[in-house]
C-alpha cells in the first residue's frame, strides 16, 4: 500500500470545546501522522472559497457562517490509505449514523456541528491541502 496524504480540519464546534488534542489523538491512534498543522480563524471569504463546491446548496450560507464563527485547526495527515482511514475515523457526517468510537459519534453535536472535515478523494485532498498550506509548511 502506498503512503498518501489527506486534509483534515477540526471545526469551530470542537475547538471551542478544547477537543483539538483528543481528536488529534484519535487520528494518530489510527496510524495517521500529522505532517502539518495550524490554527486559523477563517474569514467569510476564506470559508466561501474553501466550500465553493457547495455554493448552490441551500445550506451554504449557514455553513459559511458556522465555519467563520471560531477557530479551526487545519492539518495534513499522512499514512497508508490516509484518505479512507481518516474518513473511517471521522465517522458518518450525521453523528446519529456514525459508528461507535468514531470522532463524530464521540464529539459531534449535530449534523451541522459535526466537529471534523476530511477530504474524500486524492484530487480534493490535493486541492484542500494547497488551499491552506504551502509546500514548505508540510514537514514529513
UniProtKB/Swiss-Prot annotation:
One of its GO terms (molecular function) is nucleoside diphosphate kinase activity. The keyword Metal-binding applies. It catalyses: a 2'-deoxyribonucleoside 5'-diphosphate + ATP = a 2'-deoxyribonucleoside 5'-triphosphate + ADP; a ribonucleoside 5'-diphosphate + ATP = a ribonucleoside 5'-triphosphate + ADP. It is found in: Cytoplasm. Pfam families: NDK (PF00334). Its EC number is 2.7.4.6. InterPro entries: NDK-like_dom, NDK-like_dom_sf, Nucleoside_diP_kinase, Nucleoside_diP_kinase_AS. Keywords: ATP-binding, Cytoplasm, Kinase, Magnesium, Metal-binding, Nucleotide metabolism, Nucleotide-binding, Phosphoprotein, Transferase. One of its GO terms (cellular component) is cytoplasm. Its main location: cytoplasm. Its cofactor is Mg(2+). The active site is at 117 (pros-phosphohistidine intermediate). The keyword Kinase applies. GO terms for biological process: CTP biosynthetic process; GTP biosynthetic process; UTP biosynthetic process. ATP binds at residues 11, 59, 87, 93, 104, 114. Homotetramer. Belongs to the NDK family. HAMAP family: NDP_kinase. Major role in the synthesis of nucleoside triphosphates other than ATP. The ATP gamma phosphate is transferred to the NDP beta phosphate via a ping-pong mechanism, using a phosphorylated active-site intermediate. This is Nucleoside diphosphate kinase. The lineage of its organism: Bacteria, Pseudomonadati, Pseudomonadota, Alphaproteobacteria, Hyphomicrobiales.
Amino acid at each position: 500500500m502506498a503512503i498518501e496524504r489527506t486534509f483534515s480540519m477540526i471545526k469551530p464546534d470542537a475547538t471551542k470545546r478544547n477537543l483539538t488534542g483528543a481528536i488529534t489523538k484519535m487520528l494518530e491512534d489510527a496510524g495517521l501522522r500529522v505532517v502539518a498543522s495550524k490554527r486559523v480563524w477563517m474569514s467569510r471569504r476564506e470559508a466561501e472559497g474553501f466550500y465553493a463546491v457547495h455554493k448552490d446548496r441551500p445550506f451554504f450560507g449557514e455553513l459559511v457562517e458556522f465555519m467563520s464563527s471560531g477557530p479551526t485547526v487545519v492539518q495534513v495527515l499522512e499514512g497508508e490509505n490516509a484518505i479512507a482511514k481518516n474518513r473511517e475515523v471521522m465517522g458518518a457526517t450525521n453523528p446519529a449514523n456514525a459508528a461507535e468510537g468514531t470522532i463524530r459519534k464521540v464529539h459531534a453535536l449535530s449534523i451541522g456541528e459535526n466537529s471534523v472535515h476530511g477530504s474524500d478523494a486524492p484530487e480534493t485532498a490535493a486541492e484542500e491541502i494547497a488551499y491552506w498550506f504551502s509546500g514548505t509548511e508540510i514537514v514529513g
